[in-house]
């Protein structure tokens, strides 16, 4: 009965009686009821049941109450409701509360019955360590997303861990991220293989392989195929994207598409739906297993239903939801779907009236394909189709780009109708449409809007066309929205990347199509996916009806290719068969998709791609559009997979295809292009060798016979089969000869966007940009290897041209098709009737072979690269170690050695990087590079020449740049090595050459403090400041002496990067350098060797210099190498000393610095080659004008420079100013020269002498920046250089790039004693600055100073190529050599010099070695005058890499690295700031060690241009300074810039004035004349800042020394800068680096400088910048003394004017221009490390510049600047050393109050390096490091007292073991476990262990024997082979198998060094291992296991002399 719950408050039926006691008498349960129904009644009633409701026994006072039959009660008023009112007896309130119930969302089991694309959530792990268990794996994966299931597979037979695991993530993203982050990572010592394994197939394959004993867990073949996981990933991604598309499309389409395995999205897209609804154009193929669109083949993960692959609506088809025309090429599927679809969107081709019956369409299509008429239909459809499709894809459809007459009746065959897709508009249109689609559909991409009306299929014609344009993505990769998005995403990135890499520059097909393709490549399955994912079967393959659908690869192809199947156009093609397309269509569609082979599918994909493009064109009015849309569509989901796939996974087939999309595009474009150009050839074109598919027609009709589609599953390797013979008349697309065949899949990689494909993965292997560029160039070169390639190229070029309707090979125009629209069908595509496309019978074989070969090649390349990388790393590590040791040893020795050593140290590094990249540069191993993406790429983009001769492997860069070795660095590692060797020899000769100079250079050793590159290592290497300092100094000297070298190094690194872009130029430059021979060698070697060895020359130079410098500099700097290290300590003592010394040292340093500047430039003296380069960069005239040629004395240089400056100024905005400045500079230079001549010995020179000016020069340089580099150089020369001799005019130059060279030259020119004096005089940053500053500056007329007679060499030295080598060599050599080489770089000076140099070098911080003085390398990146202290000041502008400065706080004064980050101009500023005593670290850190002078010679104008100063506007400054408006502001003045915050503005003014007034000031004040506007720097890769004139100080260039880009004329700079920079000056003042604030003229240095400033960071990876900064910091540390001086200056701003801050600013270092490769690498680096705002600004400026310049970079025209947030976030520095002193947050130490400096930070500058020993190893893995404070942290007394206390607590009888045990606990031994030679893991001592000491306790679980036996058996079953059970006694065993400590790793030895002992501690027996003998560090700890003798012997592997042979 049903009870009704009595609700609360509800009364009982008889409330009145309720609760009353029933008075009736009870009888036997019968009551005398008083109820209405009397008891009698009741009694009489025959009760069937009764129940005792109330029992008095239970309830007191109650009467029995019965209830009868649930209704009647024994008592009339029982108060209880009868049963009919039954109520729930439970308390009602308990139900008032609602419980939240979480119902688990049912998850579909993904098994063989799973329908639809399987979400890629399942990840397969392979090669796992057998110790990894589920928990560990779960924890490992949790970080990437929720883990649903974790399963580790064990061998069922022996329960052994198979190293395979399955992890199912809750989200696809989690799975992808896990794969991305865990794949190929080391876990528990094993490099694990992680891949998306959607259905666990790979895992099961692994499982079978392992269980069958074919492989062991560690030998499991998880090669490229496994890497194919990318394919899987891609497929999965595609699936996701397809799903997304499907979701969006289906929803929009409204068609109930069964999730096609093929193309999830295909259903969604109008295209998809259309396809599904509409019989496929390939209807005839529908019969393929494909099934209808609704029932896509399950084969393909996403159902790559692309018509090609499975019925899955190919992404291509997805293009337009309305793209009925583009239904899957699988006719059946489409037809079925079409028929099924309510008014299925027949392809738009089908006239709305024409319902393509499945059969009809199929037949029609077949016939159509065969019948050109049908195809012809397509073209006509093209436009109307577009509309039709549009309706389907309305959102995406853009009005048909090319209105094509509506495809004639879609009534044409269903196929026809499908093909009726509007004929591809002319390629151009298509491309445009594509582009438009790309842009327009980008949104659609993700979800191509389903055709608004499903009617699309029927009325598809209308939407069709729009659909194409609207949903090209759908068309292209309907199923791979991800891909599409990816494409868009990648498209943009890829395009940018390509542009950057010049990969895409001009793939003609890249125009619009390129974008689309790129998009597609990246995101669109059509191109990319189709090609890659579903290898588009060769035409022939396509022709085979079932070929494609059948193949799994088809599925991958379908991923992106399916819709792009070779016959994508067939939709359009259906209507308008294209000769090639027709065949393609026929083949691809005719060929049952299902039956198609992967190749066929690939081809088909290709065809689809092409066709689709065409179809898209008709439908989209842009095949590309459609394609693009599809791509986009596809990219939506595809992107998820594809994007990740492409990005993280090796390029898979799909990826390749995508990438190939470019080719596809190309193919499409090419196909279209053929269509466009009269494509009579298509009919007549000889088929590609492989007859199967004709080469992709212009790109539409016929997917070029794709190379055999790579194994469908291996997206990464889509090896196009040998190009199939193009259908007659169908030339293969030009892009890659194989392209036509491969077209969609381009050689899976080649054709693909090199960037996307190669970038993402070369054959599944991530490729560096360099590799890609190399490959691209190679491919481009080999591009024409095929007969068709040229045509292809043309096609590609004409991608945008409306493709001619492909000629049907004898096929009549499709009915209703307007052949004209057919253009989308490339004429090269055979007509529908054309059967030559039938894939080559051997195509599959060929494709398979190619795939295998490609895989093998990829594997080989991967292996080789890995090996090379490993070797590089190992060698580098060794080199680093060696160098470190050498440095340590040398630290104590003369800095010379250290410098040499340091130089050497970088060398290996560079070599390593170079080697890594070398092959790529060489294109070695790039089997497909030869394919050539197309002339367009290389031609338009001028791909970097990978034959770049890295004359200067970044040796100097090795020191500085090596740390930030560019990908390009390894471009020509071998070359670099050879070059290095050559350079070394050259360097050697240079050394000999420079030995005289070296004498002057000797001082450099004092500069080890400035161990820019090495300094980093030094710091890193050793906590010893001394070491660091000496190293730094050495390095700095190397870098200083090799300032050019280091910058060169850096530059070389940059050049390596640049070498990518400027490879050719750089090659030339480098070659020039090489030609120059020794000089080049000097510079290059200095750079290279600095990288290599810090260049032998630099080494010797540095050594000599070091010697001199040490001697000289040690006088003042008190062995600045070591003293600087001790500076911190000495600082106090030395402070006083230094103050005195400062004056002396400053004078001397100034002299030395001048000398050094000169000397350094000398040492960095541009080799003739470099000079030539410089000359090349700067016309001879210009050089002459600027004094670059500087054959004549500095005066001539000055005059020339002045003239040049004037000319340039006039050319630039402020000719007058420049002229004035130039004249002034000339005068100043002349005066200065005279003065200099008078004071030949800078050392002895009074403060007034030029040398001090040199210090000032840096200031002046910085201030004025180079108004005229010539002037600047002249000034520099006139100053110390002048003193040294005429050569000295190069001083500015030396300040710049050629500081060392100048010094060298100077040294040569100058009296040895003078040089030596200079060199010997330690350059105290402050002192020299002060002395020179006041006297020199004062001597120099303010007017003159601004003019800077001697143009400071921009650091072109590093940039070598900046100055035309011709002029540059002699003068440069002389002046530069003497100055640069002769004068060791004092940190301060070097800062200036370096400042300039860093900027000058490559105008990229990377390139620019961090000048010790300037915290931030003067790379244009950081305008920062490296004065962390002054937040607002440009000087304080933090280095680009925060990490660089981060570390030890920098004192504003010291750390004030007045290395303006502005390239040239900025460089000078650092000099200015150097007055503030650029941090010694800065100097040290500065990769370039250049005299301050160079830096100083930065015309204020020029300075602001690159990087706004943190100083008043020039105008204000000039006004304050009393300088003429046009006159560059001397750096000296600048140092006082308020922004600097060190010197009051007044002081600054005074200082500037003094600098200006100082006759010698010109050197410092000399403003580098900007190179004449007409002077054209060597063309750099577009977008690349000109490396040549990086430094603001182009003085050398003008003087012939520095090869830094001449700064923009001062006037120009001033005008521009004052307008922009100065307008931004406030920002500049506040340290804001507003690249945009400065208008850079590419022709002007300022532009370069700015670019450099902005690009420096760009070029230099942030870490590199950081490295430089760190170097600077290290150098600062190294130059503790100078720091103190600076501090003093800082302390007494009043003195600052006296001690020009610029002193510390070394002239901008000159750097060898980066090679194209380097440039490319840098460019490409944004793909790896992102791009920061500065670089973005720089790029934007560069872009604008390039656009204005119009250097013939076609890609520029194809490039549109779109704002994008910065993607680069500086990553923590990798090297501890990089973490220099932490920059003070406020920029001022005093304002910070007290804060603790970490020991690590202190170690950087503390003398004692013992702290390092105290430091725990960086890698503590396997190390048992007690968690107690280091011994050093605990007072010995404390320890001893503890020991005594313990001893006293023991009784004499107590065994000492306990004491020892406690002692062990008290101080555990440092142990580590690592691989043992005895057996597996072993335990090793990390510290000496005395005999009989307790080593470690054997820890484990105490278990009984029984348990031990059980466990032993279980462990055996589990496959745990080793036994970790240690018997304590007869009944106790310690089991350390599962838990324990390192003792478990102790191996057995028959001759052990330890023994086990059981001791009792607190009644517990413990096993303790005691040492039997003294154990040395790293000695393995062993003991005798003493196993009982057994019959089964365990072999002993101890290998000891008395080994027993067995353990038992």
UniProtKB/Swiss-Prot annotation:
In this chain, composition skew of type Polar residues spans 22-39, 265-293, 301-315, 360-381, 405-414, 456-491, 540-560, 582-604
All residue ranges annotated as the Post-SET domain in the record: 1992-2008
Name the residue ranges of motif: RxxxRR motif: 1840-1845
Q: Which GO terms describe its molecular function?
A: histone H3K4 methyltransferase activity; histone H3K4 trimethyltransferase activity; RNA binding
Specify where the region named Disordered lies, as residue ranges. Answer: 1-42, 249-390, 402-652, 682-725, 950-1172, 1309-1328, 1345-1461, 1563-1600, 1674-1712, 1814-1842
Q: Where is there biased composition of kind Low complexity?
A: 251-264, 524-537, 1345-1356, 1418-1427
Bias (Basic residues) occurs at 1577-1587, 1681-1690
Which residue ranges does the record assign to the SET domain? 1869-1986
In short, the EC number is 2.1.1.354
GO process annotations (BP):
methylation
SUPFAM superfamilies reported in the protein's UniProt record: RNA-binding domain, RBD, SET domain
| Cited InterPro entries | COMPASS_Set1_N-SET, Nucleotide-bd_a/b_plait_sf, Post-SET_dom, RBD_domain_sf, RRM_dom, Set1-like, Set1B_RRM, SET_dom
Q: Where in the cell is it found?
A: Nucleus speckle; Chromosome
> What do we know about how this protein assembles, alone or with others?
Component of the SET1B/COMPASS complex.
Known function: Histone methyltransferase that specifically methylates 'Lys-4' of histone H3, when part of the SET1 histone methyltransferase (HMT) complex, but not if the neighboring 'Lys-9' residue is already methylated. H3 'Lys-4' methylation represents a specific tag for epigenetic transcriptional activation.
Q: Which family does it belong to?
A: Belongs to the class V-like SAM-binding methyltransferase superfamily.
Identification of the protein by name: Histone-lysine N-methyltransferase SETD1B
Q: Which organism is it from?
A: Gallus gallus
Name the gene: SETD1B
